[in-house]
Amino acid sequence: GLDPSTALFTAGIGTLIFHAVTRGKVPIFLGSSFAFIAPIIKATELYGLPGTLSGMVGVALVYFVMSALVKWQGVRVIERLFPPVVIGPVIILIGLSLAGTGVNMAKENWVLALLSLVTAVVVSMKAKGLLKLIPIFCGIIVGYLAAWLFYDLDLSGVRDAAWIGLPQFVFPKFSWEPILFMIPVAIAPVIEHIGDVYVVNTVTGKDFVKDPGLHRTLLGDGLACCFAGLVGGPPVTTYSEVTGAMSLTKITNPQVIRIAAISAILFSVVGKISALLKSIPSAVLGGIMLLLFGTIACAGIGNLVNNCIDLSRTRNIIIVSLTLTV
């Protein structure tokens, strides 16, 4: 699989690339995208890791094309190309198709999986302040502690790991099959990217769609994804959690985000951290994935509801049905 240290490294570098492209104006952090976890696992089984990395580089093509179209035709081109009646079921399908991987990982230990899942749900619904912004992290922590206390959690890798160690870079072997396999998965993160930019507009009181422009934010995200794939990291995406933290703390200075990016790069060379991340039980991650992929599916349903798609119309029923089944 992918090295956690490399994921930290590419998140940090990717964020700095994004800020360079957007002229340092947009307070957004790019982190590893959970939406790609299951496709990466499946693609690695089919094409091997180097081939899968070529698919992750290919993901950037979606961002580049969208960036060019927005620059050429304006923001409304997204609505014309991806009307809600199409994009909604596509997002639903992505979420449901990924859920199987979460189940397979969770069934290794249903107790840990359900404990992690329930913790994340409870924190998301009941917690307040900064804690409410990190339900996934809380779920993983509780699941990890339970595995350490009640199960035979192997920590030998953490003990043996060096304090300082470079990320394990892997380079892609280009092939069309994994590229075509991965590209459809990029649709949901692209839509999420656009939504996050509008949310950041609301939080900061500025219009980043106009300055530096949505085409620049899409281009920056695409270049960051491309870099990640070239060195062995997962695709990156905008982190809504960071936007939520900005809303709560009122800290919206992009310089703070760049400091966080540099911190991620520095953490990526701490071998103990990489080993600790690798020691997280699959069942814990599986429980979290059930929530994440279910959330993706719900986002698709929300897309249909929020745009008032009338499913009593035969045309809409046919479009949604074919998208979900073909």
In which residue ranges do the predicted regions lie?
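N-terminal signal-anchor module of multipass membrane proteins
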Residues: 1-27, 35-46
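Interfacial segments of multi-pass membrane proteins
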Residues: 39-47, 124, 242-257, 263-268
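Membrane-embedded helical hairpins/re-entrant loop segments and their flanking transmembrane helices
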Residues: 1-19, 184-254
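Membrane-embedded alpha-helical modules
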Residues: 46-156, 261-326
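Membrane-interfacial loop-to-helix junctions in multi-pass transporters
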Residues: 4-6, 49-50, 84-87, 111, ...
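Generic transmembrane alpha-helix signature in multi-pass membrane proteins
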Residues: 1, 37-46, 100-105, 198-200, ...
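Hydrophobic, membrane-embedded alpha-helices of multi-pass small-molecule transporters
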Residues: 112-116, 134-135, 166-197, 211-212
